[in-house]
Amino acid sequence: MHKYEHRKIEEKWQKHWLDNKLFKTKNDRFHQKYYVLDMFPYPSASGLHVGHIEGYTATDIVSRFKRMQGYNVLHPMGWDAYGLPSEQYALATGKDPKSFTYQNISNFKRQIIEMGKGVDWDKELATTDPEYFKWTQWIFKRLYEKGLAVLKDVEVNWCEGLGTVLANDEIEIINGQMVSERGHYPVIKKPMRQWVLRITEYADRLLDDLALVDWPENLKEMQRNWIGKSSGAVIEFEVASTDYKFEIFTTRPDTIYGVTYCVLSPEHPLVEKIVTQDEEKDVLRYIEQTKMKSDLDRIADKSKTGVFTGAFAKHPLTNQLIPIWIGDYVLPQYGMGAVMAVPAHDDRDYEFAMQYGLNIIEVIKGGSEGAYTGDGIHHHSGIIDGLYNEEAIEKITKHLEDRKKGYKHYTYKLRDWVFSRQRYWGEPFPVIYDEDGQIHLVPDDELPLELPYLEFIKPSGTGESPLANARDWLYVDINGKKGRRDTNTMPQLAGSSWYYIGYILKSNLGYIPLDSKEAKAVLDQFLPVDLYVGGTEHAVGHLLYARFWHKFFYDLGFVSSKEPFMKLVNQGMILGADHSKMSKSKGNSVSPDDFIQSHGADALRLFEMFMGPLEAEKPWSNEGLEGAKRFLDRVWRMFDFEITQQPVDALQTVYHQTVKKVTEDYEKLAFNTAISQMMIFVNEVYKTKVIGAAQARGFLKLLNPIAPHLTEEINETVLKHHEDLVYSEWPTYDESFLIETEVEVAIQVNGKLRGRLQVKKDMVEEDLKKLALEHENVIKHVEGLTIVKVIVIPNKIVNIVVR
């Protein structure tokens, strides 16, 4: 064979795939669909790194494998192109975000093509394309019409450094302080009027439907914890000597008889109404001090603080007077902004009671110092005396309901999605406010509402986005009145919440209207996504919001599946050679470009899949890449051997074992062990120096999803097949060849290994003894000694006992 020139071969096949649109999704309802999806990338200036290649190769292997199994495969690619990173880069460089975003997209696309990924490029989309975000804006309008998008005065995470509001999942905690995920700028709490999406309306469905999907359990648990559903009871307390009442939520209503004080958040509207004159000065001072703290500071402080209001509440069952305090560890947005304190059975309440000398009443037998928080028998508890926790909770809740003092209730940690960003580079809201402050939606036929060009996109400094400076764009006529557009833009997560649907609806004419019968038919054909591969960092951001939007689409009848992504796999991070996370600042980030030139895309793909299990973290190694290249060179040279029309008998067992193993491993995404099995097969071929034509082509099919360029080249130039392997039929195995006809038997002398025999399975015992005693190394070790006995364990061991 001619020399294996990887770049020449790879460029040839990449051109062939593009020119012939080989991976275009077919309009085929007769074959079962398979939708393989990558978490689409943000197109940064630095381009793809080898971590991207890992996930993208894994999905490409599956899409090629499924195509060969006869599925109608959808495997698209697009770009998550809006958002803060681009805007920050534009501010730093003075460049227009639109121009460099599309330059970056071109570079990313080049890299993905050069890695040999089989993508349907007719489905390509970018969240910044007007024809795409037209539908993002259209979806917002439908959310508004259904009461799920509302303007609210909310306490938001304000980042002065970025000049915008951030969602909870866009914030990190460093040294106890809230900072932005991007740039680590300080973040504070601040009240602002914002667009909010009412994801909390879907909290129970988001929880319950996790049972429908095949996701990693740790990721499901992250979503469960983020939603944070708690079961308990709301209990009403009356303020003594007044007509005022307040409610608390507790998960432990069974401890009601152990309540010795109540604590309101400093922001609770009742505080200013019930504080006594004697305590007012201290209370007001404490409220001002609380305003200087973030929520994180308030709940993280080990020493709980508070002040007495001077007021008392009546115990709802005993009418005993209970002091009412305020404490900053009680947050206004959680529960009811008020707690009943049971210091004998809650660690936080116990610390507070000890600090301020408040009463402690045990109502569950625990016998421990400090707070007892476990299960136990109730006492001093009226009608629930003698009961354990679960039964006591149910009985006391019913008792409170009967007395109109409480009711069963659920609370959630999940908060509605703050959807406004005070930045330029995002989807504009299709909203106009008239002079009376009334909201008017931009008509559907006027969408998309595009961003105006601005030479300077620095935040306005007033809390509004740079769009406040675009006067010609900002002010419009609305029914003869002066109207003003919304200056906020949508968050980056808006476009990514439905892009998996966008791929399906993408056509030569734009996008099939989401509410059309045609859209319903094609969405029913391809949804849900069969395999979604991406990182765990999106667990409580993109993945949660996409599920929310999908359920909204389900309610509108646009989709028939309750969940968007049936199987989710989190690929492990590829670390730097120093075992730390790759980053440009550390200088350990690895670009695939140089390696594709020097070793080839097939070698890079093979190496990344051979490094270890897909889900595991793995350090980068140039030496490992060399090994992958050597294996492919070995496969190339293997086709210099004689190729016979008939299968080679000596290879039949290992060939069929390899077909079975690789097929099963591809299904499990266990690519590293599939490669190991193919290496075993190649080693066996090198022993025989001959291979059957069907065995040769079958092996090429097995390797093709991982090394598509090399295998297609051999298939065409050596085997003279003109059908692309990727559309050939996946090989099958014959069970009869999987039955082992030979076994390896160990020979021991006095229990020590002295040799091995390759013999027919179930060989006659006397024949096996004879072969063992004739083994050259055994003869040496028994010479001059007396053989006492020979023990045979069939198909495993012959042990010769001598003295």
Curated annotation (Swiss-Prot):
HAMAP family: Leu_tRNA_synth_B
Gene Ontology terms describing biological process: leucyl-tRNA aminoacylation
Protein name in UniProt: Leucine--tRNA ligase
Keywords: Aminoacyl-tRNA synthetase, ATP-binding, Cytoplasm, Ligase, Nucleotide-binding, Protein biosynthesis
Annotated TM spans: none
GO cellular component term of the entry, any: cytosol
The organism of origin for this protein: Acholeplasma laidlawii (strain PG-8A)
Localisation: Cytoplasm
Catalytic activity reported: tRNA(Leu) + L-leucine + ATP = L-leucyl-tRNA(Leu) + AMP + diphosphate
EC number(s) per entry: 6.1.1.4
Span(s) of short sequence motif 'KMSKS' region: 581-585
Sites where the protein binds ATP: 584
Organism superkingdom: Bacteria
